[in-house]
Amino acid sequence: MKVRKSNNKPLKRSASFTSGTKTGSKSAKSVNSGSKSMKSTKSSSKSYKKIYEEFSDSESSNSEISDNDELSDNEISDNESSDDDEISDNESSDDDEISDNEISDDDGSDNNVYEDNDIRNIIIEDINDNYSKGKFGNFHVVIMKKNGYMNATKLCDNISNKYKNKKFKHWNENKNSKELIEELSNFLKLPKNELIILKKGGTNTEIRGSYAHPVLITHIAYWISPKFAVRIGFCMEEWKKFCEQNELDYYNMLNMAKPLNNNNKEKIIQHELREKYKGVIEIKTKSGYIDLLTDKYLVEIKDYRNWKSAIGQLLVYSVYYPKKIKCMYLFNVESNDINEIKTICFKYDIVLKIYD
């Protein structure tokens, strides 16, 4: 059988070399640029969104975990590049669940663009000008748009079906939580009442509740779910391995950490006096940390048995704040003799107060 030759010339593929690099057609460039965009998208996974996906994995059923694990890199690429494949396995089984692709594309009617590590990247739709809905793991949450604060009341209520008695009010009453809020307040230089904002009243019951700072939200989820706590631990290990500086920063932070003991009476008194005198606790100096500093007083708080240490610290810290009145608070004094303590305090101009 004879094969008839075609008079049509084959289409030529344009190619040029620039600085030793072969460059294809515009369409090829488009594909290449698309792949770069893909890499950029993948690199941004080291953000809040990755943790939320991890949380989603830990809270979903075994079948959902299996479905997610079956997605290869090529399948993820297809989902991002093809309009027809924007719906993930989870979406096909539940119309209310929204894929990662749609979350990143539909972040509110205002088309706001947030940093990669901004919690507001989980927004999927607006409720009104001030509030939006988002996806935190498998749960729908409400987010305050101006600052990214999340409705902690709703989050705890949603998860409480699985982890009973895990209400936000329980977390807020926890002594660990109070210490965390205190520390975050000092770190961010924000009043405590600005870290948790209460929204009540109004006709829209969907947006009522307590809205917490994103750092607090992570710890609230950590408190609710042991699985989430484990995932956070692995994320931290991956972060440490990413570069040597990260690991160095991590261990430097550990060296700065102070032991936490909720039964520590000194700590409890410190917080009570802070509220009473409107001062600042744990003021750092070259010689150590001052228990409490107010407009008028330099305060050290100690158990009766450690009164000598308190006097020594007050004398040292007064070098940095010579105009402050030195004040020593002693607790667990009970019926012990304090005459010697009074004499020494008088000699060094220290005001002695007994906490009972």
Swiss-Prot record:
Record region (Disordered): 1-114
Compositionally biased tracts (Acidic residues): 66-114
Compositionally biased residues, Low complexity: 14-46
Positions with biased composition (Basic residues): 1-12
Domain of life: Viruses
Cleaved signal peptide residues: none
Domain KilA-N: 130-239
Pfam families in the cross-refs: KilA-N
Name of this protein: Putative KilA-N domain-containing protein R878
Species of origin: Acanthamoeba polyphaga mimivirus (APMV)
